[in-house]
């Protein structure tokens, strides 16, 4: 939820579909998105929130740090804040999928998921613009 609005008009399976429509570089990223779409996460949680939440919090701070200065140029404050939250939530959700499929998770898994997200989404102006457009439609 950002600025009193929500991105939950789409389920995680629907967000996975949206991400699958974007340009992709690595087949392993496609695999992750398909796993997100198909994996039941009932009962799955981070094993030790005291360990994981600070790292994930810093990930959100990073996305806000990267997106909000861009909003000064394009005026998309709400959309860019929502993009930062969606990016954080997507990586967190993919981490939960990893736990569901592999039974455990280590910091290197988070780093790899974040690296893939950055390469596939964050550093593709076209993908970011498409996601900003899709976000604006649900805000």
Roles of regions detected by a PLM:
Residues 1-139:
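Hydrophobic, aromatic-lined core segments that form the binding pocket/scaffold
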């Amino acid at each position: 939820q950002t600025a009193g609005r929500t991105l939950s008009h789409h389920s995680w399976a629907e967000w996975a579909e949206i991400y699958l429509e974007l340009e992709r570089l690595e087949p392993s990223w496609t695999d992750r998105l398909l796993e997100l779409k198909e994996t039941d996460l009932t009962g799955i949680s981070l094993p030790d929130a005291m360990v994981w939440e600070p790292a994930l919090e810093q990930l959100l701070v990073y996305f806000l740090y990267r997106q909000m200065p861009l909003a000064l140029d394009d005026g998309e404050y709400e959309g860019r804040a929502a993009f930062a939250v969606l990016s954080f939530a997507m990586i967190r959700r993919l981490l939960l999928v990893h736990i569901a499929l592999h039974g455990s998770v280590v910091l290197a898994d988070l780093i790899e998921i974040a690296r893939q997200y950055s390469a596939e989404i964050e550093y593709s102006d076209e993908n970011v613009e498409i996601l900003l457009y899709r976000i604006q439609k649900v805000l």
